[in-house]
Structures are given as structure tokens and as C-alpha cells.
Amino acid sequence: MKNFTLSLFLFVTTLLSAQRDSVFIKTPIYSCVYSEILQQPKRVWYTVQCPSGSYPRKGMDFYTNDSVKTSDGKDYEANVWDKGHCAPAADFNCTRETLWQTFSYLNCILQHEKLNRGAWRLLEAYERELAKTTKVEVEIRVVYGPKAAKLPTGATIPTAFYKTIKFGNKKEVYYFANEAPATTDFTKYKVQ
């Protein structure tokens, strides 16, 4: 009986501690598929809500989620990886609450700092410009190629990103390798 109880305990413990590869999350401002194994999102969808918002982000920092194993601040220390918002803070800065929701690690990718602060940031500004006159829907597909590196802290570094922007009857697709870009001109990364 003791062996059965111990076996049952070990089975339940293993089952409960198993990390999930694809957890679907829906928040009021974005949806995502998150991998606890990679400790990174695999896909994120959102509609730009505040193209002209101005709520300040002072004092806000990323936070973990109690029900999903995510990356955390240790993954971003002393390296070239920024805490890249998938659903950008500036697209949701109409209120403190919408802005705060963008700071979840569920919405955060290990993104090369020069990409995040360059061409990617300028593409986000372009989304907001479009959203001033039409509905803008965005999907980000995060690529983890066969050579995707895993940090000693546990998170996997994406190898690339596809960003699809839908507005009016148009669709634009951009592809960015997760590295320092050759140019900040985001139009050079348009693939469709």
C-alpha cells in the first residue's frame, strides 16, 4: 500500500509540475499562445486601442503570472536582450489599467535591444499612425528555429519574428531576425 501511495503521489506531482508548450491566454487587450517550456510567447494578437494615448509608464515594470510559468527579470540581466513588448505599451496607454496589462511577462519577448529600439519601434509607431484613421489588427508569430539558444536562467531566445498588420482591406507582413538590424527602415523587412 505504501508503494502504491508513493507512486500515486509521484505521478500527481509530476503531472502537476509538467510545463505546458501552448497555453492560450485572453486578456482584455491581447490574446496569446504562451509556452512555459520556452518561457516565451509563441503568438500574440491585438487591436491597436490608443493611437494617440499619453498615459505615462513611469514606475511600471514587468510582472509574472501566478498560473503560467513565464520568464522573469533574471532572463534580461547583463545581456543584449530587451524586454520587448509584443502588444506595445504605446498602443494601450489610454488608461493606467490598459497600460499596466501590457507589462505582463506573458506579453514579453527576449528581443535584441537594437531591433526593439530601432526598426521594431518604428513599425509600432507606423501601426499607431494607421490606427488614427482605421482599425488596425496585429499578429506576431515568434520563431524558435533549431538553433534557438536557451539562457542559463531558463528562457529560450527567439530566432525571428513575423509581424502581420491588417488595416482596411490591406495586409502587410514583416520578418525580422532577432539580431541587430542592418537598418532602422522597417519597410526593408516587409515580405508581403
Model-identified regions with their sequence ranges:
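Short, His- and charge-rich active-site/binding loops that engage polyanionic ligands
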Residues: V23-D82
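Structured catalytic/translocation cores of nucleotide/phosphate-coupled proteins
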Residues: A18-R20, I25, S35-E36, S104, ...
